[in-house]
Curated annotation (Swiss-Prot):
NCBIfam families: gatA (TIGR00132)
Catalysed reactions listed for this entry: L-glutamyl-tRNA(Gln) + L-glutamine + ATP + H2O = L-glutaminyl-tRNA(Gln) + L-glutamate + ADP + phosphate + H(+)
Name recorded for this polypeptide: Glutamyl-tRNA(Gln) amidotransferase subunit A
Organism: Methanosarcina acetivorans (strain ATCC 35395 / DSM 2834 / JCM 12185 / C2A)
Subunit organization: Heterotrimer of A, B and C subunits.
Lineage: superkingdom: Archaea
């Protein structure tokens, strides 16, 4: 059997030794024996795609390299379920911008990964297709909403994957599964072809077993797209930033990210990581970001409000699941009642309430004002330091079913990740240790479009530690 957990460079070497078709077949064999329910759909065209790469001698940067795609990103010929019954049977007739870029680079799409329904969640438990298990402990969640993408990378079922991050949906599962996950600056990667949850917050982001593969993927998918009015051509060269050197780098540690309820093992691992940076020549100072305390409430009001608007389009009329009804109104009502899961309905209702005439100013408008204050906190802190560092998640992965019946507790999981989405800045989660045998993630945040500094710090940490080389015993 093919070796699991290969880097992109190792995959490319393996392709030279054998073929893209053989490498793809190896991953498909691993997926077939999976214990984690990481994929919703495995592509029946992956081998054909890989064989075509071999025959045509594609010379793109990802020629023949397999990749997994979160199932809210449109791929021609593959279902795009968003983990929801309401999109059952829907196959998009177009590719997302990031998929176009990947195919141009020669990547082979293995399949579509599991997620919280419409990317609304932090545990990948709300999927219509069942929960995904964490490869480190099959009774625990992988995080969410891109839990399938993180889990398949951690389990060796793909060398890397794409996810989307609205309030931590790439970084949370990266931390829980012990992989690297980047939320790029808002606008760095086109959202065209990504089914919208909260447009003003979300970004497509990569997950991989090492920082170098994150940079390789960003060099492919980032850049301007005229079909996404929020995309920006920053002309960033991500791989060139990967230098093993943090001497003189100023690190800010925001005390608000180490608040009440943080797991002692997580806190210890993160502080050990920060001290490691100091030993490598970086300097540290405490910073205060007082409005972070209001970020979670602001985030959920904004996200749910945008979701209630975005999800109005799913009614069974043109595509996806359709319930029977005696007239059009009855059909739409029944379709949405049966097609959406409990958590999605909850967020639609709360978002509609926040946008209603009597409460718009009290909730939605106030949340937007708080968002501005949070952004100002980041601007102020990052004017005095190069990077901010904190725990990605306040706790390690929790058990499947432990929090799903308590939405508020589940929402609180996003306390350290959602402020970054409100501010629109880049943030990467890297493995920095373990507690109770479960991975811990260090979150490194930077100035807008300063992914090079963020990735340089992450790369240096990786080069001087071995946490990213650890593999889950459950699937080894």
């Amino acid at each position: 059997m093919m070796a699991k957990w290969m880097s992109v460079a190792q995959v490319k070497d393996k392709i030279k030794e054998s073929s893209a078709e053989e490498v793809t077949a190896g991953y498909l064999e691993v997926i077939e024996k999976s214990k984690i329910n990481g994929y919703i759909t495995v592509s029946d065209k992956a081998l054909e795609q890989a064989k075509k790469i071999d025959v045509e001698g594609h010379e793109g940067p990802l020629a023949g390299v397999p990749i997994a795609i979160k199932d809210n990103i449109s791929v021609v010929g593959l279902p795009n379920s968003c983990g929801s019954k309401i999109l059952e049977g829907y196959v998009p007739p177009f590719n997302a911008h990031v998929i176009e870029k990947l195919l141009d680079a020669g990547a082979v799409i293995l399949g579509k990964t599991n997620l919280d329904e419409f990317a609304m969640g932090s545990s990948t438990e709300t999927s219509y297709y069942g929960p995904t298990a964490n490869p480190w402990d099959l009774e625990r969640v992988p995080g969410g909403s891109s839990g399938g993408s993180a889990a398949v990378v951690a389990a060796g079922e793909a060398p890397f994957a794409l996810g989307s991050d609205t309030g931590g949906s790439v970084r949370c599962p990266a931390a829980f599964c012990g992989v690297v996950g980047l939320k790029p600056t808002y606008g760095a990667v086109s959202r065209y072809g990504v089914v919208a949850y909260a447009n003003s917050l979300e970004q497509v982001g990569p997950l991989a077993n090492n920082v170098e593969d994150i940079a390789i993927l960003m060099d492919v998918i980032a850049g301007y797209d005229r079909r996404d009015s929020t995309s920006i051509d920053s002309k960033t060269e991500y791989q060139k930033a990967l230098v093993d050197d943090v001497k003189g780098l100023k690190i800010g540690v925001p005390k608000e990210f180490f608040g009440e309820g943080i797991h002692p093992g997580v806190e210890k691992a993160v502080w050990n990581a920060i001290h490691k940076f100091e030993s490598l020549g970086a300097t540290r100072q405490e910073v205060s970001m007082p409005n972070i305390n209001y970020a979670l409430a602001s985030y959920y009001i904004i996200a749910m409000s945008e979701a209630s608007s975005n999800l109005a389009r799913f009614d069974g009329t043109r595509y996806g699941f359709r319930a029977n009804g005696e007239n059009w109104h009855a059909m739409v009502s029944k379709t949405r009642a049966e097609g959406f899961g409990t958590e999605v309905k909850r967020r639609i209702l709360l978002g509609t309430y926040a946008l209603s005439a009597g409460y718009h100013d009290k909730y939605y408008l106030k949340a937007l004002k708080v968002r501005t204050l949070v952004k100002q906190d980041f601007d102020k802190a990052l004017s005095t330091v190069d990077l901010l560092m904190a725990p990605t998640m306040p706790n390690p992965a929790f058990r499947i079913g432990e929090k799903i019946e308590d939405p508020l507790t589940l929402y609180l999981s996003d306390v350290n990740t959602c402020p970054i989405n409100l501010a629109g800045v880049p943030s990467v989660s890297v493995p920095c240790g373990f507690t109770d045998g479960l991975p811990v993630g260090l979150q490194i945040m930077g100035k807008p479009f300063d992914e090079p500094t963020v990735l340089r710090a992450a790369y240096t940490f990786e080069k001087n530690t071995d946490y990213h080389t650890k593999r889950p015993p459950e699937v080894a």
